[in-house]
């Protein structure tokens, strides 16, 4: 049964990453789950348990992406990006930093996928419009994609991984934020410094802003644009009070997304049917299916082995617990995708004998490792694979070798600094 559970997991994961002939990840994960149920690797009671773990996370994610797609249609992100470039006053380094700051803000509120897949094409079009050559374009593109994941830590909704882990360990919105805001700031500063050091020779000292369009020209519907600020303010308030009124974040985000879609239907700038169709609905099926397959590993005792490793690491204190868990999560995410990794690690943490602050440190370190680790390899997250595909369609080909060489050099120091930020947070506050 152990070998069967491992084979089902590896085959499912391979087809999810490979996606032969455009095979949908939801269908692949569903097939893997059905095989696991038929063979007895998982039971029907596991189906209910897994659904209970992932429903809030996946529906929140879909709602947040829906909101971001509407904002993209009305030119909200393009307007923001043009403002950032204008604020740099023709200084290449300032523009590089400002684009990353924008990416961090977008990632925090609209999830890492929203930041990477929506902002990167806008940045690409903008730097091309400014007349930058391929050597100069590359750093801005990598920075846009990299910052989307490394700064997707501060809020539960900033990354699907965050929501899954917070739900699994019953962590509230404000409690989560209080633990992760400082690590996120550490990650942002480290990301900017490391990316600048890596690309400093390619970033132009100055650039001509004459070809830069007026920010107002990016806005496709001024009325909906103004309304969007109110929608976002209500959304943020909803997130903050959700913990106190005991309402799942998905309900808050879902209601706001529904209202926004209704408002957008009246706009000529927004193709609501296309937006709804473009939302990642397959993530719901994928999450349930993939996590059922992961539960198969738990049922045959694979996660217990990892739990024992974590118990041994926790014996060396908080610093070792955080660093060990963070780097284990990052490594596993880079080779087998962060979605199954975060749950495998969460189960293992629960099965370990770590308690109190040691367990808390591991819980958040797992999130950090699962958020940042995927930047090491192209297969680390589904968003990265899609991001590379979008860039290829737009004429920017980044080979897996180039990505890995860049990713591993940039990610490791940022991961260490971010985990250090978590350690300092837990011992000081």
UniProtKB/Swiss-Prot annotation:
Q: How does it sit in the membrane?
A: Multi-pass membrane protein
Does Cell membrane show up as a keyword for this record?
A: yes
Q: Where are the transmembrane segments?
A: 3-23, 25-45, 50-70, 98-118, 136-156, 179-199, 222-242, 244-264, 275-295, 316-336, 372-392, 408-428
> Mostly located where?
membrane
Tell me which GO cellular component terms the UniProt record holds: plasma membrane
Q: Which GO terms describe its molecular function?
A: arsenite transmembrane transporter activity
- Give the matching InterPro entries: Arsenical_pump_ArsB (IPR000802)
Query: What compartments host this protein?
Result: Cell membrane
| Family statement | Belongs to the ArsB family.
**PANTHER family (UniProt xref):** TRANSPORTER ARSB-RELATED
Name of this protein: Arsenical pump membrane protein
State the organism named in the record: Staphylococcus aureus
Organism lineage:
Bacteria, Bacillati, Bacillota, Bacilli, Bacillales
